[in-house]
Amino acid sequence: MNEIETHPFSPYIPENATTLILGSFPGREQTQTEPDNSKWFYGAKRNQFWKIISSVYNTELFCKEDKQQLFKKYGIGITDILLTVRRKNNSNLDDNLEIIEYNDQAIKAILGKSSIKSIFFTSKYVEKHFCRLFPDYKNAEYLPSPSPRYARMTKAEKINYYKSKLPK
C-alpha cells in the first residue's frame, strides 16, 4: 500500500489577491523527496504552468521568490484542493489520487477573509471537486491544464487563453 502524502506547501495568498488559482496536488517529485524551500507549486519539470505564466507576463521566473513576487504584483493566490492523498501506482495523474483529506478548510478561510473575485481551476478534476465542496460559489472557471498530457491545445494556445483570463 502506498504511503499517505501530505501537501508540502501552504496556500500563497497575497493581501491584494483578487484571483485564486486552484490545482489538485503536487507531483511525487515534490512530495516524495527531502523538504526543499526552493520547491513550490507546479514544480514538476514537464509541467508547463510556470512556462505559461512566464509567457503571459513576459518575465523570467527563476525561483520561488520570483514567482511569489509576480503573483503579489498581480494579486494572484495559489493553493490546491487536496491536502492529503494516497497515490495509486505511484502516479501523478489526478485520477490516480485517492483522496484522504480535502484542503477545504484553508480554501473556506481564503474565500471568507480575502477579496477573491475569480477562481481558476487547472483541471476538470479540480473543478468537479470544488463544485461539490463549494456549490454556492459561482465565479469560477476552468483554465486548460498545464500538464503536457493535455494535448487538445498547444502550449501557445494555452498561453493565449491564460492571457485572456488572468489579471493584467
Residue ranges and their predicted role:
Residues 107, 111, 115-119:
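Proline-aspartate-enriched helix->loop->beta-strand connector
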Residues 21-22, 143:
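Short hydrophobic beta-strand that contains or immediately precedes a catalytic carboxylate
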Residues 18-19, 118:
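Structural motif
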Residues 24-25, 121-126:
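Short, well-ordered beta-to-alpha junction loops that form the rim of enzyme active sites
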Residues 26-96:
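Short, surface-exposed acidic-centric catalytic microdomains
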Residues 51-55, 84, 109, 132, ...:
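Residue-level signal for well-ordered alpha-helical scaffold segments within enzymatic catalytic domains
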